[in-house]
Design a protein with these regions (language model features):
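Active-site loop/lid in soluble adenylation, ligation, and acyl-transfer enzymes
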Residues: 2-104, 124, 128-131
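Short coil-to-beta-strand
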Residues: 16-23, 111-125, 241-248
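Active-site microenvironments of hydrolase-like enzyme catalytic domains
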Residues: 19, 27-28, 69, 79-116, ...
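Short histidine-centered catalytic/ligand-binding loop motif
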Residues: 38-40, 126-141, 190-199
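Internal, conserved structured core segments that host functional sites
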Residues: 106-153
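Catalytic cores of processing enzymes, dominated by hydrolases/peptidases
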Residues: 144-251
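Conserved small/polar residues in nucleotide/adenosyl-binding loops
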Residues: 252-258
Length: 262
C-alpha cells in the first residue's frame, strides 16, 4: 500500500509479529506548508534515510510503515493535544475540538506542528497558522498514519497473540538549542526508549541493547529519549503488546555531506 500520506510494505505477506515504523523520514513537503525556512535548515528536522535502514523488514516477514510527509509539517509522534493554543492565530479556545495539553516538546517549538526552525529556533512562520490549518493537517495526515499503524498492530496481535513494534528514529550526535538537553551535550550512538518499562517487556529492550553493545556501540536507555506518542499509544507489555523506540545517531548511517546532497 502506498499513497501520499504513507507507505506500507509487507502487510500482505506478514509471517512474523514484527512491525517497524519510521514517522520522521518523510521528504514530500506539502504545497500549503507556507514556512519561511531555508530548505537546508528545515531538512535537519528529518530522520534522513531511516526508512532505508529498516525497509528490509518486509523481506523477512515483518511490516514496515513510513510517513511520506515531513514531521515539521505535522508530527505523528505527538499527541493531537501537544500544541500551545496561543501559538495559533485564534482567540477563542472553545471553538477547538481538541483540548490542548502541551508537553515540553511544544514549549521547545517541536510539538504537534513545529513552530521553530532547526537548529537554532527561529520562527517557522511569518504568521501563525489557523485552527483550520492545524485540523486539516491532523485529519489528512496525522490521523490516517495512526489509523494504519493501529490497524496493523491490531491485526498482528489477532494473528499472533503478541506484537513487537519498533518506532525508528535518528538523532544528532550533539544536543541543539531546540533540545531539552544542554546545547552541545554529546549523545551515545543509540538511545533505546521503553518509557521506563511501561511500553515494552524489558527482555525485548535488553535484547536490543545487548545486541548493539555487542557491536561496540554506546547505548543508553530512556535518556534523553524514552519514547513519545507512537510508543505510548498502543502498547501494553502485560498483554504482549510491545513498543520500543530506537534512536540512532546520524553518523551511524550517514554523514553531513549525504544530507546536503539528497
Amino acid at each position: 500500500m502506498s499513497d501520499k500520506i504513507l507507505n506500507v510494505e509487507g502487510d500482505e505477506g506478514q509471517s512474523i509479529p514484527l512491525i517497524i515504523d519510521s514517522p520522521h523520514s518523510g521528504t514530500e513537503y506539502p504545497l500549503d506548508f507556507n514556512h519561511q525556512a531555508e530548505l537546508s535548515k528545515l531538512r535537519q528536522a528529518e530522520d534522513t534515510h531511516v526508512n532505508e535502514l529498516y525497509e528490509y523488514v518486509s523481506s523477512i516477514g515483518g511490516v514496515f510503515i513510513e510517513a511520506k510527509f515531513p514531521r515539521s509539517y505535522i508530527d505523528p509522534n505527538r499527541s493531537e493535544t501537544d500544541f500551545i493554543f496561543e501559538d495559533l492565530n485564534e482567540k477563542n479556545n472553545s471553538i477547538s475540538e481538541i483540548k490542548f495539553n502541551p508537553t515540553i516538546k511544544s514549549e521547545l517549538g517541536i510539538g504537534l506542528v513545529w513552530i521553530k526552525i532547526p537548529p537554532n529556533g527561529e520562527p517557522m512562520y511569518k504568521d501563525k497558522i489557523t485552527l483550520k490549518q492545524l485540523m486539516d493537517r491532523v485529519n489528512i495526515y496525522h490521523r490516517p498514519y495512526h489509523k494504519i499503524l493501529k490497524h496493523t498492530l491490531n491485526e498482528t496481535y489477532k494473528n499472533y497473540g503478541k506484537f513487537y513494534h519498533v518506532n525508528a528514529h535518528s538523532m544528532q550526535n550533539q544536543a541543539t538549542a531546540m533540545s531539552d538537553q544542554s546545547q552541545g551535550t554529546i549523545r551515545p550512538d543509540f538511545v533505546i526508549g521503553d518509557r521506563e518499562g511501561t511500553s515494552c517487556h524489558r527482555k525485548f529492550t535488553d535484547l536490543i541493547v545487548d545486541f548493539l553493545r555487542g557491536l561496540n556501540y554506546s547505548v543508553d536507555i530512556n535518556y534523553p529519549y524514552k519514547g513519545m506518542e507512537l510508543v505510548k499509544a498502543y502498547s501494553d507489555p502485560l498483554q504482549n503488546k510491545n513498543s520500543v523506540q530506537i534512536e540512532a545517531v546520524s553518523y551511524t548511517h550517514l554523514t553531513l555531506p549525504t544530507i546536503l546532497l539528497v
